[in-house]
Amino acid sequence: MSLLDTVSRCEFLRAMPEALVARLEALAQIRTYPAGTELFIEGNAHPDFHIVAQGHVRLDMLVPQRGHIPILTAGPGDILAWSALVGNSVMTCTAVALEPVKTVAFPGHPLRQLCEAEHEVGFYVMRQLASAMSRRLLATRLQLLDLFADHVSALDLTPAIGHPGDPD
């Protein structure tokens, strides 16, 4: 399978016209990681943006007095290290391959330069990034609801004052 085939099969790039995917292919590298490998470490710089092509990656956060806590499992089509795409290469979690993993990696700085120079590429990339971040935020909200589900019934969630626009 060619690099273009691997890249174009990624959900992140599926909506992008083939000519634009070909522009990204010039930057893309296929990376493979054996099970148990740390792709990047929380607090460390990592310059590359990844799209998972095969396998699953666990994202952990270090919690004081508790150690590394799994927060999410990423699979095919999911993005990793998106901070590198927006100009902040310091990772907010640690990524560990749960099985053999293949990613399509893009160096963050050249990818940002391409997005800035070619606005159509930038539009597609940033639209997909926003969509992926929205899904990640929803997953986090659902985890928080699940975490606190036992405590919600014990709390009085009725506000002391009404919301703006509520009838008096």
Where are the regions that the model predicts?
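Cytosolic regulatory regions built on CNB/CRP/Popeye-like sensor folds
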Residues: 1-168
